[in-house]
């Protein structure tokens, strides 16, 4: 005999008073993106993922350009506009801007989150394949150093 059980859960909705105070701080709305802007190169010279990245800013608009690793050399991805996020993870008490950018290469989609931590650009990359190739979707984190 299979017994069924009912699980009930109380969901608590957050009000502004429940949020991280940094999200309500007007200074968080004016964070600097200077540390993100520029050319970055992967710290792993043998990477099979992203070789380099350029982050540009025009007024309040961010553009991310990526060069992936290919058998014949670097593969330039289509440029993507990025959304600025408040990076609340503090480094020496300073908050900064992080970016979210999505890339559509037809055969795959890449969702990226970029932030600087201790002078290193950290990219969290979620890849989903769209080409029915049977390849596994994956999550990866890569690290980059500034190369201006």
Task: Locate each region found by the language model.
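Amphipathic/hydrophobic helical signal segments and adjacent flexible N-terminal regions
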Residues: 1-48, 61-71, 117-148
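Central antiparallel beta-sheet cores of small beta-barrel/beta-sandwich binding domains
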Residues: 34-36, 41-110
């Amino acid at each position: 005999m299979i017994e069924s059980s009912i699980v009930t859960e109380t969901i608590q909705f957050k009000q502004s008073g429940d949020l991280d105070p940094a999200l309500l701080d007007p200074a968080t709305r004016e964070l600097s993106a200077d540390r993100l802007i520029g050319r970055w190169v992967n710290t792993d010279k043998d990477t099979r993922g992203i070789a380099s990245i350029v982050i540009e800013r025009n007024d309040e608009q961010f553009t991310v350009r990526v060069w992936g690793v290919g058998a014949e050399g670097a593969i330039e991805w289509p440029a993507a506009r990025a959304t600025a996020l408040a990076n609340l993870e503090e480094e020496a008490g300073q908050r900064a801007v992080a970016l979210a950018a999505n890339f559509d290469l037809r055969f795959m989609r890449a969702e990226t989150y970029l932030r600087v931590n201790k002078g290193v650009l950290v990219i969290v990359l979620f890849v989903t394949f769209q080409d029915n190739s049977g390849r596994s979707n994956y999550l990866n984190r890569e690290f980059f150093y500034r190369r201006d």
